[in-house]
A protein has these predicted regions:
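Bacterial Sec-dependent N-terminal signal peptides
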Residues: 1-32
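Short, compositionally stereotyped local motifs that mark structural "simplifiers"
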Residues: 27-30, 58, 523-628
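Contiguous, structured surface segment used for ligand recognition
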Residues: 28-166, 510-520, 528-530
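Feature activates predominantly on carbohydrate-active enzymes
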Residues: 102-323, 339, 364, 368, ...
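Active-site neighborhood of glycoside hydrolase catalytic domains
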Residues: 285-288, 292-390, 397-405
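Flexible, acidic glycine-rich loops studded with aromatic residues
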Residues: 376-381, 388-392, 398-559
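Extracellular carbohydrate recognition and processing domains
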Residues: 622-654, 686-706
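Short beta-strand-plus-loop segments that form exposed binding edges in beta-rich domains
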Residues: 663-669, 721-727
Length: 742
């Protein structure tokens, strides 16, 4: 699949080997062993193992599923039907359980010699992860689901001891706000398993959709799973048979599927189906745009609590996981404050604030789940709202130091901070990134990898790490229509673009001790994994070329030395500020330019798969006092009469508070007129500032001021202002937004 490669492979190998400081045990023939996540111990020995059609797979009787999995993966790519030998002591590849030799859960020992392969695990999970390591030793074509011809199926001789540092290595997939079909979920599980992640948080319920069949309440999926008009409705759900199939698929791959049944908030899809679940009983529609509904599950009605018991009973019977996720985030408590039934419960339980009702409800559910041998998991709000006595597990997404509170209150924690592990944020601000969440700064691959996980509370309370992929951007946008005639599911491609390669960074953060992590080493190994992702048909985000050096010359120019972030890929570049294409000049030696902002370079994997360019954003440090750069106008955009100018400010509006918007005239000879400014949350008008002001070179700044008191994370914000050129259209300028009060 990697047909578009340069002739510079050896040159790049030398550059990367010099640039990366590799551990001693990886130094021998390091190009052959590039494992992710990095094992605890690797010792390379002499020789290679060669797989052949006569190779056999022997296994302990308890490992039949893992043996059949290995047989299937090797069979698809080699075309060979390798023979399985149950309870065999002699086989080419031998899978055995021996807790005495491997002392840690999910640990394994892998011995590859020219004569054969021995894989020993403490448990089935360890065997499965040993298989994943073994597959990474074979050529990347091993991941193809079609027979690959002309491949030498060779693995280097090596001894590997390995085990995870943390028991919880998770990923959340949001199928509620956008429905992914069963086959895509299987592919997602495959990709998680490939990199030794073992927990899939299945976000099945949200305001925008109910995705789990509950037989006692059929309208949840008949009504709550669909949005939009009948002729163009969107949505879907998983039958209970679908769920059983996914669970079985995950079990072989050591992926535990944990259902998330959201309450008390994010439950509008259920309220649409059964209005009596809410405090008001009002009829709603399943939203086609993301927002946080004020409607909550009514805590004061026995009928609502019985609904919750019934749904959780069916869910627990369906999912064998020892955990059940109850969500619990972002509740707005005004409905409970206004509800007579909820107020009665508050009085009965001696609660002072409506928010404490959430703690009361969490206690009720946690006790119910404890009786069913389940542990409740939820977002950190579940132990921050009220006094929760029964131990729960909190997903720390907002403030990592809340792990301290979890410990103090007798709970455990999983780190999934939005600042590092929310994969619906873009990796960069480079123009050309696809539509993404913007209420926080981008999360680069390096930032994801740099997350610290043991600085906030005793290690025993932090079970591990989890990444999250939210799908609310799908229901904002129009760029994700499926292209049927090309057989292209753009929504699935979009999900993979945001998840990969950051999932590989998450894998290593979750698996390895913090002291064993090194980003340069990881980046080197990662460069050899993209071709493996290609053979898995994964639509990953291609990383930009790596700037190894950027040195000034004696003449004041700048010399760029680059290396490809993807092994064997091309680098194409331009020096005039234009975006490179696959036909731009090929980078082979350092490039010198007079102005770095005119230098662009892209990584080209193949003619249809390439990166965004290296991009140097303009320097706005001189305008720091005005806040964050938001937009600009140029002569081409200037109209001769007052016309609404609309631009997005999502991310710059970051919470409730008072903001200023400054329009700064930077160039031109004629004045620029500004009129009334309006702030929108999606299509809802939040603020309007009537004003008429003229700015020019002598009086270059116009400032507007407004207050936001109904902020919603994940919701797009826009500014619309009347603007025009006065006696001409030669002006240019910048717009900045500053939050001045909380």
């Amino acid at each position: 699949m990697k047909s578009y490669r340069t002739m510079c492979k050896k040159t790049w190998a030398v550059i990367l080997a010099i640039a990366c400081h590799l551990p001693a045990t990886w130094a021998t023939n390091a190009n052959e062993i590039e494992l992710i996540p990095k094992p605890v111990h690797v010792e390379q020995t002499s020789g290679n193992f060669r797989l052949s059609p006569k190779s056999t797979i022997g296994y302990d009787v308890a490992l039949q599923g893992q043996a059949e999995y290995l047989q299937q993966v090797l069979g698809q790519s080699t075309g060979w039907d390798l023979k399985l030998k149950k309870d065999a002591r002699k086989a080419t590849i031998l899978l055995t359980l021996n807790p005495e030799k491997v002392d840690k859960p999910e640990g394994y020992r892998l011995d590859v010699t020219p004569k054969g392969i021995s894989l020993t695990g403490r448990d089935a999970g360890g065997i499965f992860y040993g298989i994943q390591t073994l597959l990474q030793l074979f050529p990347p074509q091993v991941y193809s689901d079609k027979r690959q011809h002309g491949v030498e199926w060779i693995a280097p001789a090596v001894t590997i001891y390995d085990a995870p540092n943390r028991p919880w290595r998770g990923m959340m997939l949001d199928v509620a706000r956008y429905f992914y079909d069963k086959e895509f979920v299987k592919k997602y599980i495959d990709m998680m398993a490939m990199y030794k992640l073992n927990k899939l948080q299945f976000h099945l319920i949200d305001d925008s959709g109910w995705r789990l069949e509950i037989k006692k309440y059929p309208r949840l999926t008949e009504v709550g799973a669909w949005a939009g008009p009948d002729h163009n409705r969107l949505g879907g759900f998983y039958t209970q048979e679908d769920i059983k199939e996914l669970i079985a698929y995950g079990q072989v791959r050591n992926v535990e599927i944990i259902p998330e049944i959201e309450f008390p908030a994010h439950i509008l899809s259920a309220v649409v189906a059964y209005p009596w679940l809410s405090c008001t009983g009002l009829q709603h529609e399943v939203p086609t745009q993301h927002f946080i509904s004020r409607d909550l599950l009514c805590v004061g009605k026995e009928s609502s609590l019985q609904f919750l018991r019934d749904v959780l009973d069916e869910t627990v019977r369906l999912f064998p996981s020892s955990y059940i996720n109850i969500g619990g985030d972002e509740a707005v408590y005004t409905r409970w404050e206004e509800c007579p039934d909820c107020q009665k419960v508050m009085k009965r339980e001696g609660l002072k604030k409506a928010s404490e009702l959430q703690g009361y409800l969490t206690n009720v559910v946690a006790e119910m789940m404890k009786e069913k041998n389940r542990t409740v998991v939820g977002w950190e709000e579940i132990f921050l709202r009220g006094d929760v006595k029964t131990p729960v597990v909190g997903l720390i997404w907002h403030n990592v130091r809340d792990t301290l509170l979890a410990t103090q209150r007798g709970h455990k924690a999983i780190l999934t901070p939005a600042t590092h592990m929310y994969f619906d944020f873009p990796e960069s601000r480079t123009p050309g990134e696809v539509k993404a969440a913007t209420w926080m700064p981008p999360i680069s691959l390096e930032k994801c990898y740099s997350m610290e996980i043991n600085d906030y509370s005793p290690e025993s309370t932090v079970l591990g790490v989890q990444g999250c992929f939210w799908s609310d951007q799908f229901i904002h946008g129009t760029v994700l229509q499926e292209i049927d005639y090309l057989n292209e599911n753009r929504s699935e491609n979009y999900a993979e673009y945001f998840t990969f390669p950051r999932l590989l960074a998450l894998s290593e953060v979750a698996w390895c001790r913090q002291s064993d992590r090194n980003y340069s080493d990881f980046r080197h190994r990662l460069s050899h994994h993209f071709n493996r992702l290609d053979f898995k048909n994964c639509h990953y985000r291609v990383p930009e070329p790596v700037i190894e050096q950027m040195n000034p010359t004696a003449t004041g120019a700048i010399e760029f030395t680059l290396s490809p972030a993807v092994a064997d890929a091309d680098i194409r570049y331009t020096t005039d500020g234009s975006y490179p294409t696959v036909h731009s000049p090929l980078y082979t030696t350092p490039v010198t330019v007079n102005d770095k902002s005119n230098f662009r370079a892209i990584t080209v994997v193949n003619p249809r798969h390439y990166s965004l360019p290296i991009y140097f954003a303009p320097d706005y440090s001189g305008y720091k006092q005005y806040g964050e750069y938001t937009a600009e106008w140029k002569p081409l955009n200037v109209q001769p009469y007052l016309t609404p100018w609309r631009f997005e400010c999502t991310g710059k509006i970051s919470g409730n508070g008072t903001y200023t918007v400054s329009f700064i005239y930077t160039k031109g000879e004629t004045p620029f007129r500004l009129g009334t400014l309006k702030l929108y949350k999606r299509d809802e008008l939040l603020a309007e500032v009537p004003q008429s002001v003229l700015i020019n070179a002598n009086s270059p700044i116009a400032t507007y001021r407004f207050t936001v008191d109904s902020f919603e994370a994940g919701t797009p914000f826009f500014i619309e202002v009347e603007a025009c050129g006065e006696k001409g259209n030669d002006t240019s300028g910048l717009v900045f937004i500053n939050k001045v009060t909380q």
